[in-house]
Amino acid sequence: MKTIRIIGAGLSGCEAAYYLLKKGYFVELYEIKTIKKNPIQHYDYFCELAYSDSFRSTDLNTSVGTLKKELELLDSLIIKAARYASINQNNELVVNRIEFSKYITNYLKTFNNLKIIEQEYLNIDLNIPTIIAIGPISTPNFLTNLKKLINKENLKLFDTVEPTILKQSINMDICYSLDNNLNYLYCDLNKEQFEKFYNALISAKTFNSPLKNEIELLEKNNYFSIESLAKNKQEFINHFKPINNNAYITITLKKDSVINNLYTIVNFQTNLMWNEQLKVFSLIPGLENLKIMKYGVMHKNNYINTKKLLNLGVQLKTNKNIFFAGQIIGVDGYVESVCSGLISAINLDRYLNNKKMIIPNKNSTIGSLYNYLLKTDSNFSPMRINWALVDMIGGFELSDNSKKIYSKRAIKLIKQYLKKINT
């Protein structure tokens, strides 16, 4: 029986373990939390949900609803557990955190081919097939060893994400480019517009992190949010110098390096609550009807330069026995982490059986996420699923009808992928 190691019993690690246990591998699952918890851990069960109890929408018209459906078709343990521990009947999958974690822990322990090793994993053995599925707050000792494996410049320790908005929601009669260079768009604010925007920004509510002193930690490492910058009004004004003489300040939008339909609001990394981001940033002229596809976040995180380090099978290019899963590859969100664990496990199994490693078609939600991660540049920030990542059908739009088309197409493609991996 072939031995596989999985480092981390979080969402991605447990999803990967479940798939490989079913395949008959002997799985060594390393998890240190029972002997040494990090600041956001409280229980000994696997898959502890620290930041939220929600797996977001179940509506198939949403990208994340479709992503969950794709995972169900692929027999996801985590989604099965979330359904079991669900505490509401609405279009949102909210779970009882304890029951959710208990279900996964107890289910995995029924496998005789699972060995749970409750200790810190320090030395990465390159001779043993391994999935590295560490979470956002990993032990310093393990990170030191990881840096030796991938070089420290390829590992980022903080997440400072600017909001990403849909191009079609930008009013091009107000926002403008210079010399027809659509890589950058500009939004001018006069003094009255600035004052209204500024007052809304400084009074907006921020996210309360479960990690104590997280903002202080970020600022200590020179990562400052837009709301923190706004504490000094004049410094804030100087930060957004006007391009036109008639403007008081100018805010810049930058086109995404992979998806032409997405723009980020430059230097707007933020810790504002999501509903507050929509309310405040829609006060920027030209963004009155903005659709935010990825909200800004700032938190402690560990993620690697996926495009540079990993191949199509999320396998380390420099050592074929090492695979990665979870937030460390640059996915953002519970459901996204689950799918990364499953894809890593599928491809590790295929690699060990001398089969071609494959990911789903780029117009499935799973495939679209991987297509983005494996193409984006080294300056990317973690991505969560959204419909802008799939190919357009007759011009990109977000009507209910188009979402339905995208969802049906994605589910059909995952069914085709399921047939491929089972042959």
Swiss-Prot record:
Domain of life: Bacteria
Binding site for FAD: 8-13
Subcellular location: Cytoplasm
Pfam families tied to this protein: GIDA
Reactions catalysed, as given in the entry: uridine(54) in tRNA + (6R)-5,10-methylene-5,6,7,8-tetrahydrofolate + NADH + H(+) = 5-methyluridine(54) in tRNA + (6S)-5,6,7,8-tetrahydrofolate + NAD(+); uridine(54) in tRNA + (6R)-5,10-methylene-5,6,7,8-tetrahydrofolate + NADPH + H(+) = 5-methyluridine(54) in tRNA + (6S)-5,6,7,8-tetrahydrofolate + NADP(+)
Transmembrane segments: none
Keyword Transferase in record: yes
EC nos: 2.1.1.74
Record-level GO cellular component terms: cytosol
Top-rank EC class of the record's enzyme: transferase
Principal location class: cytoplasm
Gene Ontology MF annotations: flavin adenine dinucleotide binding; tRNA (uracil(54)-C5)-methyltransferase activity, 5,10-methylenetetrahydrofolate-dependent
Cofactor(s) for this UniProt protein: FAD
UniProt GO BP: tRNA methylation; tRNA wobble uridine modification
Key words of the record: Cytoplasm, FAD, Flavoprotein, Methyltransferase, NAD, NADP, Transferase, tRNA processing
Family in the record: Belongs to the MnmG family. TrmFO subfamily.
HAMAP family for the chain: TrmFO
Function as written in the Swiss-Prot or TrEMBL entry: Catalyzes the folate-dependent formation of 5-methyl-uridine at position 54 (M-5-U54) in all tRNAs.
The protein's name: Methylenetetrahydrofolate--tRNA-(uracil-5-)-methyltransferase TrmFO 2
Organism whose genome encodes this protein: Mycoplasma capricolum subsp. capricolum (strain California kid / ATCC 27343 / NCTC 10154)
